[in-house]
Amino acid sequence: MQIIRHSEQTLKTALISKNPVLVSQYEKLDAGEQRLMNEAFQPASDLFGPITLHSPSDWITSHPEAPQDFEQFFSDPYRKTPSPNKRSIYIQSIGSLGNTRIISEEYIKWVTGYCKAYFYGLRVKLLEPVPVSATRCSFRVNENTHNLQIHAGDILKFLKKKKPEDAFCVVGITMIDLYPRDSWNFVFGQASLTDGVGIFSFARYGSDFYSMRYEGKVKKLKKTSSSDYSIFDNYYIPEITSVLLLRSCKTLTHEIGHIFGLRHCQWLACLMQGSNHLEEADRRPLNLCPICLRKLQCAIGFSTVERYKALVRWIDDESSDTPGATPEHSCEDNGNLPKPVEAFKEWKEWIIKCLAVLQK
């Protein structure tokens, strides 16, 4: 295992900058926010630790990238920033997300509520769910894993056409595996930062995807018609578990972070670290490091205290209700399904420690 440690001065410069204007901006932050963010360069901090690499196949080793500090983020002329008329994140589900309509509806509300807390201060809205056939995307059966896959680039074109006027971005989510081009095996997600759209699949986050008993394999490899989407009818969907929900929330917020202009983090253990495989993605924390937190706060303008409180409320709320963020049709059940948040409990304890620092 390799540990990537930066010097105190390197981390301090990455967070605060040496640009007098940006230093002045930092000094105007709430005292508690400065106290929390300063944990970035405290060697003994138990809130923010170094990045650990476990194998040569990990992202940083296999995909060398230039690091992005706060000043580089702030000065990037191409990054997207929400405007008064474009402060909504839209989520578009493609295909069913659960084994029943009710489970599917609850799952999308859980994910929506999480995004609403994570990107605190922005509106998060749902577009009406659509079947795969509505996208007119290309699809195939993967030659190695024998599961169905839909073409990510085609979905991005579909989302771009559906993008509402007040949208900062539109993100599609699906339980069907994705591929970006014929020569690729798969991709977890793909985004167009210019167009403000992204598509992300949670198919490989089910506990059984890589097992011999995976039920999503198409038994007969036959040439499928490009216009016959009936193959997706009643296609296998993994069980919605706490781990799958955590992985879904982690991936979705990471990828939306890219749409804001946050590049892969190479400073500290952080949600914005790249991941090359599921084991590495599971190691990546749910939280942003102080450098990436400052970037997101700069883009949205939230109170860090209120954002963390909103995340704790999302974990604590047994109800899945997300007022104002559900499609107009109603559920047929008499109550909400319990939200499986067991996997988030450790992170809740971490947030409470951060709130203690913020509110000293």
UniProtKB/Swiss-Prot annotation:
Its cofactor is Zn(2+). Binds 2 Zn(2+) ions per subunit. One is catalytic, whereas the other seems to have a structural role. Signal peptide: none annotated. GO terms for molecular function: metal ion binding; metallopeptidase activity. Pfam families: Peptidase_M54. One of its GO terms (biological process) is proteolysis. It is an enzyme of class 3 (hydrolase). Keywords: Hydrolase, Metal-binding, Metalloprotease, Protease, Zinc. InterPro entries: Archaemetzincin, MetalloPept_cat_dom_sf, Pept_M54_archaemetzincn. Zn(2+) 1 binds at H254, H258, H264. The active site is at E255. Its EC number is 3.4.-.-. It comes from the Eukaryota. Zn(2+) 2 binds at C265, C270, C289, C292. Belongs to the peptidase M54 family. Probable zinc metalloprotease. This is Archaemetzincin-2.
